[in-house]
Amino acid sequence: MSIKSFSTAVFFAATSALAAPTFADTITLDLWSRADRSGPLRAGNIVTAAEQLNRMFEAAGSDTRVEINLVETNNKGFDADALALLKAHSIGETPDIAVAAHEWIGSFVEAGLAANLEEHIEASPWFYADMIPELWTSVMYKGERYGIPQDSEIRMFFVNNDILRDAGYDQNFIDELPGRVDRGEFTMYDWCDLAADTVKKGAAKIGWVHRPNVGPDFQMAMASFGIEIYNAEEAKLQITKSGLTKYYGWLKYCVDNGSLPADMTTFSWDSTHAAFRGGDALGKFHGIWNVGAQMEAFGLTGSKDYFDKLTWIHSPAAENGGEPKNLSHPIVYIVGETEHKDLAALLVAMASMPVPNTAHAVGTNHTPITYGQVSMPEFQEKGWALVAGTPLLARAEFMPNHAKIGQYNAITYTGVQAVETGEMTPEEAVDMVLEELEIELGDDVIILD
């Protein structure tokens, strides 16, 4: 096959699932993206893909060229950016491609902003067949895919092995801990008992810490207690009273046994990080992007040093035999319902290929989106932590693609605060939270029991 025919075949095969494009000599696509130092190549890879496509057009003897108009916003977070994007769409300024947090996909679909990519994905296995399958869940809405994951992460429990050693636990215990968690043999209650034991023996000053404010991290702990917070068929949030009671009861148990500070929700982020990185706390649950700061804080030089010092585990199961969980929060590309959605989908596919995505992932401490990336030299050399984290995606939960998940998280967090500080019993906190969910979310939430 000639270079010309190959380029043409790639272009038309990748776009065949959408309407055939009508090209002018120069086509301008609008790309919406936050100015985000934590992920500059999310937008940059689209620009690079357009440059590559232009080289293909030139090689094929075509005068067609693609230009990218970057609509770069200064919104402080992905939620604010999503609201601004919806506002732009409402006044007819829908971008052809947007970088967004996956949980907003439902809102984008309902607003008529996001194009359905099912047929595009199915028709393009050379781009997508190696995608880590769990990641597709993050772009689903009512059973269909409306985005392409661009990065992922793992939020899990970090464990300080030296504190375990100082408390009298041998290397065999440390080595077997991840496997015991994975098999459901080490529970959430076992975790708090272990952390409390290290405090009682003087090996740790604090048992473990969690984030000090509202956020998605708590979802993995809730999932460990059987709380499935989304009903995909009805596209609604949901909560189970029995599961929430068990979850809040576990938090009370951890405070009462001395493993979790009662004032945890009054900590600052600096004091939370310092508790673990300073060697005071046995554990912390947060995200894989902490590895760099942990390496520096503990004076570590590579993967061998790191995993001798620290162990990663899922959020353990609530009961023996249950399933452990963790959390991932992908950022995604969506394709707008615009005149050039077919061309936009092709650029998204090109930007999602292993070479550009690896440059983004390794440079920003994100796990890969395809299995093949972990064998690439750049990942092997610089991304050893990301390679180690990739298998954990098999247990990953994702935030629901629902516009009110932020409110849901904020309300359930008030129960965390109330229980940990002792202001309410778990049962009282559950009643308060369920009442607030019904008032604030109305028909958007299902109370299961």
Model-derived segments and spans:
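Hinge/lid segment of periplasmic solute-binding proteins
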Residues: 100-156, 165, 189, 307-316, ...
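Extracytoplasmic/periplasmic solute-binding protein
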Residues: 142-151, 155, 182-237
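Glycine-centered hinge/linker elements that transmit conformational signals in sensory
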Residues: 190-198, 233-268, 315
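Long, aromatic- and glycine/proline-rich binding clefts that accommodate carbohydrate-like moieties
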Residues: 307-317, 361-418, 443-449
